[in-house]
Amino acid sequence: MSGRRLKRAAWNPPLAFLLPLPNNGIVLTRNNARLTLDGARAILAVAEKKAREIKVPQNIAVVDEGGHLLAFARMDGAKLSSIEVALTKARAAALRRAPTGPSPSSGEPSILLSLGLPLATEGKLTCIRGGLPLLVEGQCVGGIGVSAGTEDEDVLVAQAGVVELAKVAS
């Protein structure tokens, strides 16, 4: 009996093919800009140069739009404890499509947000400043995260990378 049921089930095609497609069956795709390894390296090089200018050795991470690592540099003398922080900042900026840090309305992160966001995301997101989204024509193609200096120094170095992307993307 169970063999018979299986046999019958095998002949029943899935009903998904009966559902209508949106747009009268026309499937639309969109050309999306992508951050390449060469682009990530160019961003990283400029950010690293800025870190040298301000004399703060930094950990710098560049990720794609999905938060996956494309390029990373740990400058000589950068804090080892900040490696994962830089990656988390880059990932958070890319995935949230927004700079890391307190929300513009509050100005200061609440203790709940500061602790809750990393805990709720198993350490994958942060509200510490120093992560910026990388945008091309309004589309997020990745993120840059910088850590080892003060939050202001981290943001300054990350901004240098964002400016470089604007140059190479135009």
Give a label for each model feature.
Residues R4-R8:
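Basic polycationic patches enriched in arginine
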Residues P20-S170:
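Flexible, solvent-exposed loop/hinge segments and secondary-structure transition points
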